[in-house]
Amino acid sequence: MDNNNACVLVDGHSAELKLRSSTIGPNVLGIGSLYEQTKMFTYDPGFTSTASCESSITFIDGDEGVLLHRGYPIEQLAEHGDFLEVCYLLLYGELPTAAQKKDFDYRVVHHTMVHEQMSRFFTGFRRDAHPMAVMCGCVGALSAFYHDSTDITDPHQRMVASLRMIAKMPTLAAMAYKYHIGQPFVYPKNDLDYASNFLRMCFAVPCEEYVVNPVLARAMDRIFILHADHEQNASTSTVRLAGSSGANPFACIAAGIACLWGPAHGGANERALNMLTEIGTVDRIPEYIARAKDKNDPFRLMGFGHRVYKNYDPRAKIMQKTAHEVLGELGIKDDPLLDIAIELERIALTDDYFIEKKLYPNVDFYSGITLKALGFPTTMFTVLFALARTVGWIAQWNEMIEDPDQRIGRPRQLYTGAPLREYVPLSKR
């Protein structure tokens, strides 16, 4: 047997499986030939121990609380970079030079307008429709307007589609918000940066001048960076799976948005904010801590723990700082929700129960407070998540298209239904 392979014994028969090495993190065992050698599949619900692809975009070390994009720590990117710089990094693999950054920013900014006919899509929805429902429909419909960039075999068309989606998502998200609250749409302005443009499209009204607060714009930009990509999560895997069939990029991103809408994925910050509201005051925290520890109580602390992180989510530290900056800039000194959040965090980092179960604050814990302070209703939280994550989805989709090992996704199953049986005519049943 090759020293780079592993031997698996199944019912007295051996199977030789190839070991594949990672740059950092766990190596993987290639099981593609397992069925051929043993006539057996592996069983791993939720992909707990299964790598579905090879990727060079994002790395997470959940035990150490590390998040890297193309090798760069998220802390450094959020502190020193801006969102479009991170977009360039995710798409192309390297940080841009000054000239590359200027050119990339220009190309994104000049794709922010959407076809005027798109406005008719919004009028077809009820005003009280959830903005995520609207986003699913409108993003999927982009392929009907921009069918000159849907040939996935053409690298140029793929890149044009990538830029279009990164550029148009803020416009569509702002339109969804404006339609939801009954205000007129606001067109983008090419002389504003990405985050400032988005805030203006959301909060400007025709009857008065709107000046973007640079502190709030920087906070919005940082929130986008923190949500740009997060490895092979549910929505990213959905985008890859849809893309493996050859679906156009707009359809793939719409599929990702639909998956992100699930409360276990993109809706966590909304649930965390609702939990803080339910607790109400700091003096009620012990009551809810006791409930969280009670196995028979359905109450769960939202914003704590993570499927991957078994340490402090590095994004949570940055989000906490951002929350303080936003509240300070807006003069919100005695926000009860922030007081509750800070005390809950203190308890979680010192209480043996939370430490033993590795329940540390995650990025959703502070993001809800921050977005609420910026003026967004809870129904928009997941929309903002989708807006930011679009670049990650696109980068992962492009990588999947270019990977020669990838083919259409076709998971196997453990069948537990009825064995072969004969059809019985209706008259004899």
Curated annotation (Swiss-Prot):
It is an enzyme of class 2 (transferase). The keyword Methyltransferase does not apply. Pathway: Carbohydrate metabolism; tricarboxylic acid cycle; isocitrate from oxaloacetate: step 1/2. The active site is at 306, 364. InterPro entries: Citrate_synth-like_lrg_a-sub, Citrate_synth-like_sm_a-sub, Citrate_synthase, Citrate_synthase_AS, Citrate_synthase_bac-typ, Citrate_synthase_sf, Citrate_synthase_typ-I. Its EC number is 2.3.3.16. It catalyses: oxaloacetate + acetyl-CoA + H2O = citrate + CoA + H(+). One of its GO terms (biological process) is tricarboxylic acid cycle. It comes from the Bacteria. GO terms for molecular function: citrate (Si)-synthase activity. The keyword Isomerase does not apply. Keywords: Plasmid, Transferase, Tricarboxylic acid cycle. GO terms for cellular component: cytoplasm. The exact function of the plasmid-encoded citrate synthase is not clear, it could help nodulation by allowing the bacteria to use citrate as a chelator of iron and calcium. Belongs to the citrate synthase family. This is Citrate synthase, plasmid. It comes from Rhizobium tropici.
